[in-house]
């Protein structure tokens, strides 16, 4: 039990004319990533953990006699336009909140509950509102029969559901834009290290994002891995720029995570942004399943991430009722409270240490590797890596594996946190079948790297 007192975190100040703080609240149980965090009677929306308090910033600025910037506080009619009306279907709402367009396969793409020959995917809405999770499986990616793109995206903020779906639909297209196309001018890698000249955030190459090349972990294919890593960095950069200048999606206080996997032959290329996660299910010498985490949860608790944020004047502290959840805040205002150190969107924090540069890694598939599970934090907050691998290994069929994980996570939420709201869950299970192992090691990475050299790198 954690007692919530009437004290304030370091740096917390009232706006001029603000009412006195409410008395101390009763002790509440600790819970992971609550969507709304209450402090001293005031509600600060935790982006990445929940909605953001635009009204609070408006009150602070008006009390100080400062005009509200249009780029930070868009007019009401613009915000309404960013959330299009959707007609409810009779007979109840779908748990996955997927539209007919999501359910219709397009060029090997599946973006709703279902399964393909190589993967299964499933999402279920929690009880916090609209489902902000999105997912995608794209077979024959880049027109290659043995190549698959998978991704899960966890939106947050008032328009997180729009941001996550935008990234789901556009990011793989940006990634494939420079594969297998002639006549495109090579884009310099400076695109991911240059500053955005029109405000709203700066992208810089950081030491913690540099992955050592030519090691056993990377499969001893430094040249091929470097080419693919550069391509992935470009795609993430251009995707974030698309969100920044999008005319109908307000991403100032909204954003999304992204964890993606490209599989070809023996090769897996993983790109991660935020706190969604990819876990490998493999077998040990006794043929027993165990879990290998392929990504790192990029949260403000990581020393290198925290150092970057503080260097750029961002603040990091936890709310009293969530002492284990570090959040990122603006230098002078206690908002938005982002529970991750990297994300698409969230442009209010892009000048203060938040970046959209993914952590990129490579894994060579072995004969012991069976599947990869990509999931949002609605799953990982209540199930361990080992539990998820065990659940998938015991599923009745590969087609039902993702649904089995989501339903298990929902039950775990009700059992472990009965007073908390259930988070949205999205899962993609990618099965590493024997057909993918017939190619010699490294052949997939080499094929994709050759395609990059032929196609150039124009992603804009």
Curated annotation (Swiss-Prot):
GO molecular function list: metal ion binding; protein serine/threonine phosphatase activity
UniProt entry keywords in alphabetical sequence: Hydrolase, Magnesium, Manganese, Metal-binding, Protein phosphatase
Binding site residues for Mn(2+) 2: 154, 377, 423
Disulfide bond residue pairs: none
E.C. designation(s): 3.1.3.16
CC cofactor note: Binds 2 magnesium or manganese ions per subunit.
Region (Disordered) residue spans: 1-30, 83-111, 192-219
Bias-annotated ranges (Basic and acidic residues): 100-109, 201-210
Cofactor(s) demanded: Mg(2+); Mn(2+)
InterPro entries named among the record's database cross-references: PP2C, PPM-type-like_dom_sf, PPM-type_phosphatase-like_dom
Binding site for Mn(2+) 1: 154-155
Annotated SMART domains: PP2Cc
Single GO biological process annotation from the record: regulation of intracellular signal transduction
Catalytic activity: O-phospho-L-seryl-[protein] + H2O = L-seryl-[protein] + phosphate; O-phospho-L-threonyl-[protein] + H2O = L-threonyl-[protein] + phosphate
Pfam families given in the database record: PP2C (PF00481)
Domain PPM-type phosphatase per the UniProt entry, residue ranges: 118-432
Similarity section: Belongs to the PP2C family.
Name listed for the protein in its UniProt record: Probable protein phosphatase 2C 38
